[in-house]
Amino acid sequence: IEFTQKAYDLDSVNEIDFPASENLTAEGILENSATLSNVRINDFSPSEQFYNQTQSIRAYYSFFDVDVDRYMIDGEYTQTFLSAREINYDNLGEDVSWLSKHLKYTHGYGITLSRVDAITATGQPKMIIDNIPPESDTQDIQVKRPEIYFGESTDDYIITNTSEQEFDY
């Protein structure tokens, strides 16, 4: 461990104790309102299920993973769930062939992005980016190139710029 810390230049890090208090006061809440307003109330698994139920949109698209990221929205860092809409070759049915897998269905399309700290009136994730083509409810984040050629489960080769037309959603 000592040599790993040296290799990553972590051997000169200053450690400082941060005393935590278990006493929550109104004053403490007010002083930390930005942090508390960004507390995650959603979870990965239900969000992924919701994305697959409502945002796959086509049978051959799936969401395989949900990541947490922060984006600047309305001047504040906002914690979000992010997931890529990927091609799911298992759902192509009879249309799975070398041509369809490597020349035609070459990419997923778009993402979903939802707040971790907000839900709709029906208890669903509050979407920031959804639909095909991607629609954003904020000017701060716009998807300009929604094609996803490499993702969580997209691990096979494809060939582009051929006479076969790539399928876009």
Where are these regions (language model features)?
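Soluble extracytoplasmic regions of secretory-pathway and membrane proteins
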Residues: E2-Y169
